[in-house]
Amino acid sequence: MLLDKLSVLSFLGLAPIFAAAQLSGSVGPLTSASTKAATKTCNVLDYGAKADKSTDLGAPLASAFADCKSGGLVYVPSGDYALSTWARLSGGEAWALQIDGIIYRTGTDGGNMIYIEHSSDFELFSSTSEGAMQGLGYEFHADDNWSGPRLLRLYEVTDFSVHDFILVDSPSFHFSLDTCTNGEIYNMAIRGGNHGGLDGIDVWSNNIWVHDVEVTNKDECVTVKSPSKNILIESIYCNWSGGCGMGSFGSDTNVSDITYRNIYTWSSNNMMLIKSNGGSGFVENVLLENFIGHGNAYSLDIDSYWASMSAVDGDGVQLSNITVKNWKGTEAYGAERGPVKVVCADGAPCYDITIEDFAMWTEEGDSQWYSCESAYGSGYCLQDSDDHVSYSVTTSTVSSAPSGYSATSMAADLTTDFGSTVSIPIPTIPTSFYPGATPYSALMANSASTAAASSIASHATVHSSSASVAASVPSAVAPSESIPAATSAVVSSAAAIAPSPAVGAQEGSTTSAPSFAAPSGAGNSPQGPTGASGFGEKGQQGEQGEQGEQGEQGVCYV
């Protein structure tokens, strides 16, 4: 249903907040969804959509967008909808997409089920916090097919937010942010199959804030790819996932000013994986702060010879100024996979790596190891020298637990995975993503005036040492009285595809990374890649690496 708290939440939609200086400026839409809805509302039911779980939503969604793309709100009411032809929504400005219903995949083409491109001042949300896309990926996976469609992709979108939305069981990746700017992603739940190639959120963009998100899968939780700059990722709940990371990185890697903060990881492949194998370029200014982990195969895993991707030409990606700070918890078996692994390229030794306030201990056995190669800095096995020459792997083993390693667990930690060949239920969005941390924004479903007011207060006090940036907060909307007439949709049998990120050979063809202009006020931070190894090192085959995308059949677009 469309909510009715316009005055308070419309104000909230433009409320300034203090977010970490890792961002270079404001994030989120420039106008509230309520303002857009008051301008014009395009209800898909008035364009031929039916909430019967069989009538294709593709053409009605494209037609509604065509009428509201220059300013307005496209509305998908509560109910069950089928999507058999994918929706490509191109060129919108000052518009919003409110999905309160559940969209079920019924088509079988590749590509992206919903593809938003070349848009500005955009917001995608569910006013009930129950809107979802159900990809029914198990129907592909039961036939050992891992290259089906992705659920949601944004390409060249600026000043935007996606929030209060659920993505379930994608046949391939769940959510990609491709060459976007000034975006905020929050209050989301993503639940995928227990297999590689089913990424949660992949980001290769500039000035993006991702926070308060839960991911279940067995590949990327929230991952930064190249090129990326000024990315703040915090309050992430990797609940039986692959884990957070950066990469895979190949040729011309260009990644800087990345912060991961308040990351909770349970029963995953790793807490943080920075992965590459050969290649060139750089990753610099990364902060990995306040991590809690339990039951994970790896903890900190920096691997410049990552075996799950084919080697790329080049001496290696240069890693520098990476700070790992305040990590607590336990790993599954420290004698087999130690909590600190920093393996850098012999042709490009990493430097200015700092590991401090790091206390992890093994759940099985009574020892664990720390391993470094061609890595310089301070802490554990890192070598302290200004002469950054390559050196062989050095490993130290300890048999006593470090002080202060004990860390709390989350009550919602899953007790088993969801497999990959049976239907996965649609979850609810949690209200807690990291122990002791309050989400920055209340769920829209819970955002009565009192909750909204408290959200303003929490936004005003987020990082006292940070720069002020504007960010979007849930804004309720109401439809305008007049409903436009339906327009015809255009159905394409083959749509052109946006470029892919620069990645390693296993993730599709490598592209050159554009250089971002250095933003003013950008803080320094260390960074790292993602991936999934451990737990049998399974499921990372090819990572479906942003490849293919040609010949997307059956795309509804305007």
Curated annotation (Swiss-Prot):
Enzyme class: hydrolase
Molecular function via GO: polygalacturonase activity; rhamnogalacturonan alpha-L-rhamnopyranosyl-(1->4)-alpha-D-galactopyranosyluronide lyase activity
Signal sequence annotation: 1-21
Active site: 219, 294
SUPFAM superfamilies with a match to the protein in the record: Pectin lyase-like
Sequence intervals crossing the membrane: none
Tree of life domain: Eukaryota
Chief location of this protein within or outside the cell: secreted
Cellular component annotations (GO), alphabetically ordered: extracellular region
InterPro entries: Glyco_hydro_28, Pectin_lyas_fold, Pectin_lyase_fold/virulence
Compartment(s): Secreted
Disulfide pairings: 42-68, 221-238, 344-350, 372-381
Catalyses which reaction(s): Endohydrolysis of alpha-D-GalA-(1->2)-alpha-L-Rha glycosidic bond in the rhamnogalacturonan I backbone with initial inversion of anomeric configuration releasing oligosaccharides with beta-D-GalA at the reducing end
Known glycosylation sites: 145, 239, 254, 321
This enzyme's EC code(s): 3.2.1.171
Alphabetical keyword list: Carbohydrate metabolism, Cell wall biogenesis/degradation, Disulfide bond, Glycoprotein, Glycosidase, Hydrolase, Polysaccharide degradation, Secreted, Signal
One Pfam family per UniProt: Glyco_hydro_28
GO biological process, one term: cell wall organization
Biased composition (Low complexity): 503-526
Annotated region (Disordered), positions in chain: 503-558
Family: Belongs to the glycosyl hydrolase 28 family.
Cited function: Pectinolytic enzymes consist of four classes of enzymes: pectine lyase, polygalacturonase, pectin methylesterase and rhamnogalacturonase. Hydrolyzes alpha-D-galacturonopyranosyl-(1,2)-alpha-L-rhamnopyranosyl linkages in the backbone of the hairy regions of pectins.
Cross-referenced PANTHER family: PECTIN LYASE SUPERFAMILY PROTEIN-RELATED, PTHR31736
Protein's UniProt name: Probable rhamnogalacturonase B
Native species: Aspergillus niger (strain ATCC MYA-4892 / CBS 513.88 / FGSC A1513)
